[in-house]
Every structure is written in structure tokens, then in C-alpha cells.
Amino acid sequence: MTKLQPSWPTPLVESEPRLTQYYRFALSNQYTSAGTHTVNYGNARGGGIVAFNRIEVDLLPPGYIQHHTAAADGFGDTTALMKFRIASANAEHGNYILTALLGHTFASSPKNGAATDSWNPVLAGGIGFLHHFNVESALGGIMPTGKIAQQGRSILWNSLVQDHVTPHVFLELENNATFYFASSHDGKLQNFVTPGAFYIYKRKEWKPTEPFLVFGSGIQIATSGFHTYNHNTILEMRILF
């Protein structure tokens, strides 16, 4: 795929426009607006495979959620995702990408998941410039299949800039915005700034056909008056193949 698209690392939070074959091991550690501590082992990450150079299919198994309160711990919901690469070019031919994504979350957890299934359409893209910078943006929504008055709907708009500092290190700064409609959060905005970093590990004699590792970390910091959580630390290890 390196001949067809850019070679940036997958963002910590924002939807990834590139097509990749991977598995992500992740953990998130956050504090709710009430000050309670929640850990998500898995963080709704999983794996994906690429087919026909334009399609990616992902399966995101449920993470295990530990509340550190009287709330019941347990697994969350499962999500399936499909991507279609609309247009792209590698660094030698424009360094850009535009991709459509469609996810479906299955309400599989009565205590730690959503009340109903939901659809998640997203349009994501990015472009590189000045040899070592790239900017990306993704606009999408969460549309439950029922119980709208209870769950509401939301629009997600994420943007970022990445800097390829060294052959092995990328730095990232994301902005993650969620606009709420209906439910008790109707009309509210939740916004985070997310600084992050990635270390790419490849063996000394690595070839493009061989797998490699990416280690990532970052923290979501609330910048809006309304937020359901804050100081969300994210740790990841990825295997790309």
C-alpha cells in the first residue's frame, strides 16, 4: 500500500483515512466529570485487513471497562468497520488521501454499552506538505437505530497535524470535537486537545513486505466547559503487516 497512499501513522483518536493491515493493543485511563476513575482495557481497538487495494474491513472487539466505583465492570460493545479509499497518492505523487468509512456498533453489553445499535459514517482525508508535516481531518456522526430521546445523536469533527521528527518518531496534535443533538446533552459541545507521540520500530534489515511495530501514547485534555471525562491517557502498541 505504500505505493498508493501516504505513510503516516494512524492517529490516536481520529479516524484513520489510510488503509492498513494491523492489530492494535490499547488502554485508556480517564477521569469522569464527577472525578471517578475509569480504565478501558482494549479501548475499542482491534484489527483490520485490506482487500483489492481499495477496501479495508475491521473488527473492533469490546474492551473491558473497569469503573473503580459501584458500577458493574465488564465488556463494552463490538464494532465492525468498512473503509473505501476514494483517492490517494504516495509522497512522490502528491501525498494525499480521501476515504469513506462506515461503522456499525452492536449493542452487545447491557451494563457497559449503548442502549441500541448505531451507525457511524465518516469522511476522512489528509495531505502532506514540507516533506515532514501532514494534516488530516475527519467528519462523521453517531446515529443510533432507536431510543433517540435517551441516547441522542452526535456529530464528530476531528483534525490533526503530525510532524515526522526523525525516521522513527512522529509527533501529533489532535483536536477532537463532538456536537450533541437530542437527549440530555442536546446543544452541547465537548472538545479535547490531544498531544501524542509515536515510535516506529523496524528491524535493521527491514523490508516493506515485513511487519513492524508502532508504539503510541497521548492524553486528551478537555478545553470545553462541558465534558463527560478528562485527562484521558491513551497507550497503544500496533503490529502492522
Residue ranges and their predicted role:
Residues 1-241:
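Transmembrane beta-barrel domains of Gram-negative outer membranes and organellar outer membranes
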